[in-house]
């Protein structure tokens, strides 16, 4: 209903059986972006944990994935890039810089870790890349662990979209 009210001309609903990841992979060649609902673990609402089905999809596809939270939708007023300076995080920043999806929104590049000259340089490099693409960019470097620091940061940012790479550590 919201999509139609927003002017979307063509909607396609399908009922599918089988594994979510298999269905998403089937649609991937024709998709530019996937939007999935999230089921956060109630046991730790201050941490970022995704439902295992959503996590499997994110690991399997090569397209960007938006994970929608529960509750009232608010259009993003800014975006926060969770940035660790890795090659993958750098590719994420490059993808954002090329994408029209976030154009016009201010950015915050957030790094969680030790306050070192190398970390400051990595943040500056990410900021410069996004600024060259026309974004207004701030940076922040915070001590702690990303799983605790990022949710707290997002609460201070109002209606913000979190952009992050997938953590490649295998859950055991």
Where are these regions (language model features)?
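Short acidic/Ser/Thr-enriched loop-to-helix initiation segments
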Residues: 47-63, 69-133
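Short, flexible loop segments at the rims of nucleotide/cofactor-binding pockets, characterized by
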Residues: 10-14, 43-46, 85, 139-142
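Glycine/small-residue-rich hydrophobic helix-like segments
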Residues: 105-170
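Short loop/turn motifs at secondary-structure junctions
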Residues: 7-10, 30, 75, 103, ...
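Short, well-ordered alpha-helical microsegments
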Residues: 21-22, 89-90, 147-148
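Gly/Ser-rich helix-loop-strand patches that form or flank binding pockets
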Residues: 13, 19-72, 154-172
């Amino acid at each position: 209903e919201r999509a139609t009210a927003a002017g979307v001309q063509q909607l396609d609903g399908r009922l599918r059986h089988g594994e979510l990841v298999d269905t998403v992979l089937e649609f991937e060649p024709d998709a530019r972006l996937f939007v999935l609902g999230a089921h956060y673990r109630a046991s730790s609402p201050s941490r970022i944990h995704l439902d295992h089905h959503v996590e499997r999809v994110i690991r399997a596809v090569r397209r960007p994935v938006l994970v929608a939270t529960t509750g009232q939708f608010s259009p993003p007023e800014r975006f926060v890039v969770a940035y660790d300076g890795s090659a993958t995080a750098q590719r994420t920043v490059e993808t954002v810089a090329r994408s029209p999806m976030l154009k016009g929104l201010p950015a915050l590049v957030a790094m969680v870790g030790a306050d070192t000259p190398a970390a400051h340089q990595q943040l500056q490099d990410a900021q410069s890349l996004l600024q060259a693409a026309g974004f207004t960019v701030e940076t922040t470097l915070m001590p702690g662990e990303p799983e605790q620091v990022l949710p707290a940061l997002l609460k201070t940012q109002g209606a913000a979209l979190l952009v992050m790479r997938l953590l490649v550590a295998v859950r055991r």
